[in-house]
Amino acid sequence: MSGGGSSSGPRSKDRNLNGRSAQYDEVPADPRHPETNLETLHDRDLALSADPLPPPPLPLHPPFGAEFYPSDSEEPVTTLELRPVRRFIPDSWKNIFKGKKENPWENPMTEINYTSGGVPCSPPRSPSLPASEPHGKNLAGDSKTVASSYRDPYGGSGGSYNSRREEEAMLPHDPYGSLGRQTQTVKTYSERVEEYNMRYAYMKSWAGLLRILCIVELLLGAAVFACVTAYIHKDNEWYNMFGYSQPYGYTASMQGGYYYSGPKTPFVLVVAGLAWIVTIILLVLGMSMYYRTILLDSTWWPLTEFGINISLFILYMAGAIVYVNDTNRGGLCYYQLFNTPVNASFCRVEGGQTAAIIFLFVSMLMYFISAMVSLKLWRHESARKRREFLGQEMNPNQISPPKVMREVALGNGHMIDVPDQQRDMRKVEMKPELLSGYIPAGHIPKPIVMPDYVAKYQAIKAEDERERYKAVFNDQFAEYKELHAEVQAVMKKFSELDAVMQKLPRNPENQHEYERIAKVLQEYQKKKNEPTFLEKKERCEYLKNKLSHIKQRIQEYDKVMDWNDGYN
């Protein structure tokens, strides 16, 4: 009893010590151990505790090659190498600018925190280890099995609670982790060309031409600003020599009523800068969806753009005239009294000034062209809106009010979409256009579309006519019932197929799947637009309207006859 008590004391103590690492109870034992029999088990020392061994710390070297099992001749790791290295720029920031990820095993040893908290006591000997062998023998062989047999299901290693970062630093990333991700299908060349055409198709229109002209105007405006600014030092020389007064006392009468007070280069720079800012605003606005969807549908914006371009044209024309006048100093360079060797530098026209004059007049011409294109855009949009209005007037039945859906709670946590009750949108019937005077050239009268049964089955005037209408109604009603049942069956089948088509994947995983789904959808659309089915559907709708018209005529006649009988 005493022996049992003495042996149970250390065992309970070990259990209490291992109680802090209870999450390692699912670690499997080492499957690789030498074959033993009953006699060898009797000769071995049993462990002091029945608890499973804690997993050892992760290896210091990569698990491949001869370097995984270091030799005993290597120098031990010093305490300085165990300190964490703190860098001014983290390695995660450096990896952003690298195209290829570095191998974690290539990092220096000091960057890997390979220490482990371990357990406060030394582990007991394994039952598979012979008692005759020393405890430190075959350490290298044991490290092979131990390092590869224990795996922590909780994310740690060696009894350490914060060893997840050690595992991330030591083990490389899973090379097969990307196989589970959804692969993106590569677009074909034709699909990319179609997408490009859809995105930039508006550049072929008059609005796109305006955007191209804006880009050219920005380049010319920048050239004007640069060329004019390059020779602004001549203005300082002029004001330093003559000030703000007329040189040599020339009066207005001698100049023919003209007075030149000095260079007007600031005015030219202000004109170029203002035009550049307005042009870049027009360019950015024209590239937006707001311009294409809202502004082009308005009646005032094309005319506003025309006014802006005309204003900039006038400003550039004024700036060009002022700058040309500055090059000959208001006509003073044509007088011999002023054009002396001392003042020759003021009358000399440099190459940059000539380029500035050319750019000024070309920019003026570009803004005039933009104004004309704006007028053309205004006429084009007006014609487009008129065509759309005429198309809506010719086909009023094809326009249906939008169906507004709203969510309704069922009470069990589910929501369904039901059509919201809306006010009936009454159709506004357009009155026929009345033309007074002569018929304008190119006028096409609008045809009046009327079903044939309206003119054929007019108001009933006699009893035999009523019987004839009734016979036609009974004869074609059977055909209508048969067609209606057939069309309704097909429409029900189509509604079921629509629900199935909605469940098809929108983003297939590969190109083969994408082509297969596209082929199925194409065949389905072909079935829905089959001429035979569409003809039956049209015939059913026609018979429905015709029979309703005949029935209305019969009811009107019966009402009149009942009224006459009651009166008599």
UniProtKB/Swiss-Prot annotation:
Residues 1-211, 288-303, 376-568 are cytoplasmic. The chain crosses the membrane at residues 212-232, 267-287, 304-324, 355-375. The keyword Protein biosynthesis does not apply. Residues 451-562 form the OCEL domain. Residues 29-46 have a biased composition (Basic and acidic residues). Residues 52-62 have a biased composition (Pro residues). Residues 205-379 form the MARVEL domain. Residues 233-266, 325-354 are extracellular. InterPro entries: ELL/occludin, Marvel, Occludin_ELL. Keywords: Cell junction, Cell membrane, Coiled coil, Membrane, Tight junction, Transmembrane, Transmembrane helix. Pfam families: MARVEL, Occludin_ELL. One of its GO terms (cellular component) is tight junction. Belongs to the ELL/occludin family. This is MARVEL domain-containing protein 2. It comes from Xenopus tropicalis. The lineage of its organism: Eukaryota, Metazoa, Chordata, Craniata, Vertebrata. The gene is marveld2.
